[in-house]
Amino acid sequence: MKKLVIIIGILAIVLTVAFIFWRNEVKSKSPEEGFDYVEGDTRIHVYYNRPYKKGRVIFAPDGLVPFGKVWRTGANEATYIETNKVLLIKGQELQPGKYSIWTIPNAERWQVIFNADYPSWGINFNGEANHDPSADVVKVDVPVSTTENEIEQFTISIEKTGDEMELIFLWDKTVVAVPFVVTGQ
């Protein structure tokens, strides 16, 4: 019995060390990023992982992020946004709270989805997006634009232009901007 306990203990230690090594290895390829947009009493926090292009085709029918399929909008864990104010996104209200962000990229337009469920990992065991459509709160379609400069690492930012703001996704030569307004609530 004592040998069994020792073997189980050693196995647990080995598995823990292997998991920590694997997690650090994965994170080094797509480091995590979090940022806060703060203005007055408005606070918006975004958390995501930033994969690199590394010479790959990113957005295409057979690209790393295929057209028409749900994408976790980053790598590793699910991307999320947290707000303490109501955000009016193309006429739809996103209440204060924490939401995962999912996208369905296409050549001309993207569907951007804010979802009340935020799983710890962005894909399931089948390698598919860990997205639960029944928890979708806001869905908007936005146009795709391009830039001449190639963006090597996936980037999300928030920019203010007048009274409006934009949640911006940049990668490769693709730029997607989701316009929104922070309401006073």
Where are the predicted features?
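Aromatic-capped interface at the extracytoplasmic side
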Residues: 18-33
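Surface-exposed, gly/pro-biased binding rims or lids
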Residues: 121-163
